[in-house]
Amino acid sequence: MDITDIRIKKVESKNSGSKLLAYVAVTFDNCLVLHNIRVIKGQKGVFIAMPNRRTRVGEYKDIVHPISQDFRKTLQTSIFKEYIRENPADLELELDF
């Protein structure tokens, strides 16, 4: 399965403490789109968070997620490269790719 398109929607927060940097939509093989991947700045650097929902007991469960670490790394690297391409001023972010 190939990544054929990545769309980044940067979040401009008025709250300087906001950790959410962007929402991402990834297209696979020009036939499947995965929306609402988040780019988040955490204590250990920037990472992606997969779409999730809150359960009745208040836990968050991923709706979809990579099965293997290799694919997660591929997905994250592709998203980070596109994020930096669109936002070159954010090069100082600690991106792991």
Swiss-Prot record:
Pfam families: SpoVG. It comes from the Bacteria. SUPFAM superfamilies: SpoVG-like. Could be involved in septation. NCBIfam families: PRK13259.1. Belongs to the SpoVG family. This is Putative septation protein SpoVG. It comes from Borrelia garinii subsp. bavariensis (strain ATCC BAA-2496 / DSM 23469 / PBi).
